[in-house]
Swiss-Prot record:
Molecular function terms, GO-annotated: ATP binding; ATP hydrolysis activity; ATP-dependent peptidase activity; metalloendopeptidase activity; zinc ion binding
Catalytic machinery residues: 427
Cytoplasmic topological intervals: 1-5, 132-619
Keywords: ATP-binding, Cell membrane, Hydrolase, Membrane, Metal-binding, Metalloprotease, Nucleotide-binding, Protease, Transmembrane, Transmembrane helix, Zinc
Name by which UniProt lists this protein: ATP-dependent zinc metalloprotease FtsH
Membrane topology value: Multi-pass membrane protein
Keyword Transcription regulation: no
HAMAP family: FtsH
Alphabetized CDD domains for the sequence: RecA-like_FtsH (cd19501)
PANTHER family per the UniProt record, alphabetical: ATP-DEPENDENT ZINC METALLOPROTEASE FTSH 1, CHLOROPLASTIC-RELATED (PTHR23076:SF113), METALLOPROTEASE M41 FTSH (PTHR23076)
Cofactor(s) listed: Zn(2+)
Annotated Zn(2+) binding sites: 426, 430, 502
Organism: Ruminiclostridium cellulolyticum (strain ATCC 35319 / DSM 5812 / JCM 6584 / H10)
Role summary: Acts as a processive, ATP-dependent zinc metallopeptidase for both cytoplasmic and membrane proteins. Plays a role in the quality control of integral membrane proteins.
Length: 619
């Protein structure tokens, strides 16, 4: 049946029909004769009869010519005297035996309708084609299946993913293992009167493995697994979303026990009534149907819903209540142990050199998700292949880490000497500030080679994972971020635009200290603003702030005070360590890149070598 799918098949059929009709309606047309030849034959008395039809004359000769033919067709030129009068005169003069005028033959009614019917058929085929494309393609049998679910069912996949393929999420796997156990042996739970959760919501940042966990549940359970994206419900026509939800659950009930996985459920499950303008939202109708199917009047036994999102704050409360999504599993960033386990999983099949230690690599990748770590090792493998090496070494992994964090280096970009000096002192200021004030961070590399969107970078890493930050640690973050701007002011007596991203970070930290963390001396243990971390247009747009204009001015003053005090401290620290600042900048201008070990050596030996005067920047 696959050959009967698509618009091409119907176009070929239509062309064949036209060819057949043309073949059967074709007649044996007589050959043509010129008008001058006709006049010659008339003068010779060889014309028996003439039949005139508008500007075409059909003649019959007395004596055959050209393959014994006696009938010919003559096209009468429009610029000659009236052919009818000439032929009538010839008839009167006995030059021809017969002359008659005929009307054009009328084709059969079905022939005259062919162009109209053909146009209608072509338009219908084009309409079918566009509808098919808008519904995701797949052939003519899907043209009218607007309300059918787009869910893909997986049963006994040979390349299935199990919990062994998921690392760094032990607690999350334990939560989901209960679901698998219920599907395999529900009797144990039923005898105790326990009710298995109807739905499990996987929540976490992008790249932490939510979809991978769902695939692992599918592989472990050994039951039919339906997977669909939240955006697949709502498409072109009104009412299609609700219809697809009904069809999805009908299929699931027929294959129970089974699992239904809805990825990015926030595309269809967002808060109702949050649309601007108050108009009806097709998503709301789809969500209402989803709510009914999950926990309504219908019986829905043996169907477990898994869903994933990184925006739980915008989901509708009715969707999150017990009875629908009974359990919420937070898939967070992996800790150092989890990162090491993830590295072991993704390093399978990759030849590693002897100098590679996965525990050290896990230590220098705080904040990396599972997807980041996989990308890191893949980039390292690509760098190794580019260098024609047989094994992935520590050097390639380190370069890949910087590439993932900062972006690829743009060594071909031409920078003026003035810009290089500004960048060198700016990055040196960051590095010196890290060494002076931070006990938890270590400088890995200082570079003035442009990378990503930055003109240079100072890469550092925390010594350990942190769950909380104290006020002094946040002040340290501000001082480190202001190190570049302070170094510019000390060495140039002016500042540049290179600190724009640093200032944005500084202002965000200081404002959070005042409005979210209660770290202001004047305002004390109070928080201000919306409790929601992210604004959801429609729901949050009309919400007013919960403090007065006078209090807003105090908040701004407190933010400014924190930043100003930190900046003065930064300037003071760098002035006290001007020798180290100058030395590091000189080395950066010479080498363009300083690794962590060399930076430590410069920092320790700069004072011993003596002070050098601060160079004046040109331009």
């Amino acid at each position: 049946m696959k050959y009967f799918k698509g618009i091409s098949f119907y176009i070929i059929i239509f062309i064949l029909i036209l060819v057949i009709i043309t073949f059967f309606t074709a007649t044996d047309n007589p050959p043509k004769m010129s008008y001058s030849e006709l006049l010659t034959e008339m003068k010779a008395g060889n014309v028996k009869s003439i039949g005139l039809q508008t500007d075409t004359a059909t003649i019959e000769l007395k004596k055959p010519k050209e393959n014994n033919r006696t009938k010919f067709v003559v096209i009468v030129p429009p610029d000659v005297t009236s052919a009818s009068e000439r032929f009538t005169a010839a008839l009167d003069n006995k030059l021809i035996e017969d002359f008659h005028v005929t009307q054009p033959p009328q084709p059969p009614w079905w022939v005259s309708m062919l162009p109209t019917v053909g146009l209608v058929i072509i338009l219908i085929l084009i309409w079918f084609f566009f509808i098919q494309q808008s519904q995701g393609g797949g052939g003519g049998n899907r043209v009218m299946s607007f309300g059918k679910s787009r869910a893909k069912m997986t049963v006994d996949d040979k390349k299935k993913i199990t919990f062994e393929n998921v690392a760094g999420a032990d607690e999350e796997k334990e939560e989901l293992a209960e679901i698998v156990e219920f599907l395999k042996a529900p009797k144990k739970f039923v005898e105790l009167g326990a009710r298995i959760p109807k739905g499990v919501l996987l929540v976490g940042p992008p790249g932490t493995g939510k979809t991978l966990l769902a695939k692992a549940v599918s592989g472990e359970a050994g039951v039919p697994f339906f997977s669909i994206s939240g955006s697949d419900f709502v498409e072109m026509f009104v009412g299609v979303g609700a219809s697809r939800v009904r069809d999805l659950f009908e299929q699931a009930k027929k294959n129970a026990p089974c699992i239904v996985f809805i990825d990015e459920i926030d595309a269809v499950g967002r808060h109702r009534g949050a649309g601007l303008g108050g108009g009806h939202d097709e998503r709301e109708q789809t969500l209402n149907q989803l709510l009914v199917e999950m926990d309504g009047f219908g019986i829905n036994e043996g169907v477990i819903i898994l869903a994933a999102t990184n925006r739980p704050d915008i989901l509708d409360p009715a969707l999150l209540r017990p009875g629908r999504f009974d359990r919420r599993v937070v898939v967070g960033l992996p800790d150092i142990k989890g990162r090491e386990q993830i590295l072991k999983v993704h390093s399978r099949g990759k030849p590693l050199a002897d100098d590679v230690r996965l525990d050290d690599l896990a230590r220098i990748t705080p904040g990396f998700t599972g997807a980041d770590i996989e990308n890191l090792l893949n980039e390292a493998a690509l760098l190794t292949a580019r260098a024609n090496k047989k094994k992935i070494g520590n050097e390639e992994i380190k370069e890949a880490a910087f590439k993932v964090m900062m972006g690829p280096e743009k060594k071909s970009r031409v920078m003026s000497e003035h810009d290089k000096k500004v960048t060198a002192y700016h990055e040196a200021g960051h590095a010196i500030a890290i060494k002076l004030v931070s006990s938890s961070q270590k400088v890995d590399r200082v570079s003035i080679i442009p990378a990503g969107m930055a003109g240079g970078y100072t890469a550092s890493r925390p010594q350990e994972d942190k769950s909380y930050h104290t006020r002094s640690q946040l002040i340290e973050e501000i001082i480190i971020a202001l190190g570049g701007r302070a170094a510019e002011e000390i060495t140039m007596d002016e500042v540049s635009t290179g600190a724009s991203s640093d200032l944005k970070k500084v202002n965000q930290i200081a404002r959070n200290m005042v409005t979210k963390y209660g770290m202001s001396e004047k305002l004390g243990n109070m928080i201000f603003g919306n409790d929601n971390d992210e604004v959801f247009i429609g729901r949050d747009l009309a919400q007013a702030r919960n403090y007065s204009d006078e209090l807003a001015a105090i908040i701004d003053n407190e933010v400014k005070s924190i930043i100003d005090n930190a900046y003065q401290k930064t300037v003071s620290l760098l002035r006290e360590n001007i020798v180290r600042l100058n030395k590091l900048a000189e080395v950066l201008l010479e080498k363009e890149k300083v690794e962590g070990a060399e930076f430590e050596e410069i920092f320790e030996n700069a004072v011993l070598e003596g002070s050098s005067q601060t160079p004046q920047l040109e331009g």
